[in-house]
């Protein structure tokens, strides 16, 4: 496994602006746009170490494509978390699984004035004409997509804000509207769906009460429905108020609750129904659509929430550790009533799934899912291959290279394409053998390498990003 953990989960990546990266192979002549990515820029502050892959200080990465060339820039998000860490040499704010060392007095004060991290490092999106770095806290940070300079905190409407949100908003391009889910913690907590439109007030569309809120990293959306999958990893909100331990360590796995699907009518905001299933866990929904009188929900599922603990850095540094396998499941919810049931679409290990969202979100004709995976011959360590799964046939295509650890595969469709998979896959790959990273460009149909652009340094393991054609970098 060489020095993969230190390279992928280590110290700060230097901030750089590079006009031209060395390119091997041939870039598509139609690829004119920008890949923006978000993730941790360091897992250490001074002598202190963050504890979990979902911790760290946010860094943005930008790969821009021109004729036969790729440029690169990266920059830390200039948040309070980052600025105070730089000034003091210490971790300043509580993160997903890391709590700053505090005196007893400091812990008592944190109960009355908890310092929520603004290190928005998980994903990014273009919402209401702004580019936002997204976190699971309600503090989302606007940035300039050209310079990567931090603009400031994006303010939601007071009626929308909760204490937790997903980093995977859904988009309805036909109506220029985005949707997201927030959780408000209280004596009776609520899940709330809201919409965001440029030039308009944000609107709460629906809410569901709950006494023990679940950890939900994403939610589903079909043509006519929102889907909240309430995994039985739940919290007593009082424990969060006391702030005695890091955020995720307040949650408990309660499999006796099962995993209900809450389905909401997109057009009326009314609850359609609750559809029970056996307990399982997931970070990522993939797609959802109506098929006859059934609602189909595809997601990457685990039998329990042990994957959360598997991402603690001390476990990821263990050369013999193996990640729990996430698998692509298709759940069918009978809208007339009854329990949800599922079928397995592939035996392949999967995480960080992507598909052609632009054309096939909520579309029953969608077929291909791309994801990071673990090679069956090299199961120890971290995600070390990419897979393409055909949801109709179960066929799996792979990309794997020794000592290489790819990140989220972003699909970019060829302009004017007819076939769903006519395009390329972009993935930032850590090359542990060389001690650097490179941007991999795969042909999405054959899954063969077309090109790679090599960086002079390793990029820490991040999470999510997106590709923006040249013109949409200008806000709508």
Predicted regions and their residues:
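Beta-propeller domains
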Residues: 1-476
């Amino acid at each position: 496994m060489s020095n993969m953990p230190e390279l992928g989960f280590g110290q700060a990546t230097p901030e750089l602006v590079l006009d031209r990266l060395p390119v091997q192979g041939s870039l598509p002549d139609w690829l004119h746009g920008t890949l923006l990515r978000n993730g941790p820029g360091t897992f250490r502050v001074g002598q202190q170490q963050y504890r979990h892959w979902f911790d760290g200080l946010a860094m943005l990465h930008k790969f821009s494509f021109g004729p036969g060339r790729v440029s690169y820039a990266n920059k830390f998000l200039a948040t309070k978390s980052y600025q105070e860490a730089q000034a003091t040499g210490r971790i300043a704010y509580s993160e997903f699984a890391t709590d700053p060392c505090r005196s007893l007095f400091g812990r008592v004060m944190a109960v009355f004035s908890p310092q929520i991290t603004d290190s928005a490092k998980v994903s990014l999106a273009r919402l209401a004409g702004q580019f936002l770095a997204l976190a699971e806290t309600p503090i989302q940070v606007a940035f300039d997509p050209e310079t990567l300079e931090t603009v400031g905190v994006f303010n939601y409407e007071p009626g929308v804000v909760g204490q937790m949100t997903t980093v995977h908003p859904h988009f309805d391009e036909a109506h220029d509207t985005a949707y997201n889910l927030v959780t408000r913690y209280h004596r009776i907590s609520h899940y709330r769906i809201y919409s965001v439109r440029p030039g308009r007030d944000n609107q709460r569309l629906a809410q569901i009460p709950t006494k023990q809120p679940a950890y939900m990293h994403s939610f589903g959306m079909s043509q006519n429905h929102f889907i909240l999958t309430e995994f039985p990893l739940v919290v007593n909100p009082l424990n969060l108020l006391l702030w005695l331990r890091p955020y995720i360590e307040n949650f408990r796995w309660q499999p006796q609750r099962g995993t209900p699907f809450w389905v909401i009518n997109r057009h009326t905001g009314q609850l359609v129904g609750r559809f029970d299933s056996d307990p399982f866990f997931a970070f990522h929904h993939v797609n959802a659509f109506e098929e006859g009188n059934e609602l189909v929900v595809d997601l990457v599922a685990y039998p329990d929430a042990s994957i959360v603990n598997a991402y603690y850095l001390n476990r990821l540094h263990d050369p013999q550790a193996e990640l729990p396998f996430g698998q692509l499941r298709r759940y069918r919810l009978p809208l007339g009533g009854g329990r949800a049931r599922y079928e397995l679409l592939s035996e392949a290990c999967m995480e960080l799934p992507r598909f052609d969202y632009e054309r096939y979100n909520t579309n029953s004709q969608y077929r291909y899912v791309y994801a990071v995976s673990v090679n069956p011959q090299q199961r120890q360590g971290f995600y070390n291959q990419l897979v393409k799964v055909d949801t109709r046939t179960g066929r799996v295509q792979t990309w794997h290279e020794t000592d290489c650890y790819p990140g989220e595969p972003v699909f970019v469709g060829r302009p004017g394409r007819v076939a769903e998979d006519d395009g390329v896959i972009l993935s930032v790959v850590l090359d542990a053998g060389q001690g650097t990273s490179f941007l991999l460009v795969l042909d999405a149909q054959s899954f063969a390498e077309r090109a790679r652009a090599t960086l002079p340094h390793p990029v820490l393991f991040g999470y999510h990003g997106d590709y923006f054609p040249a013109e949409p970098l200008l806000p709508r």
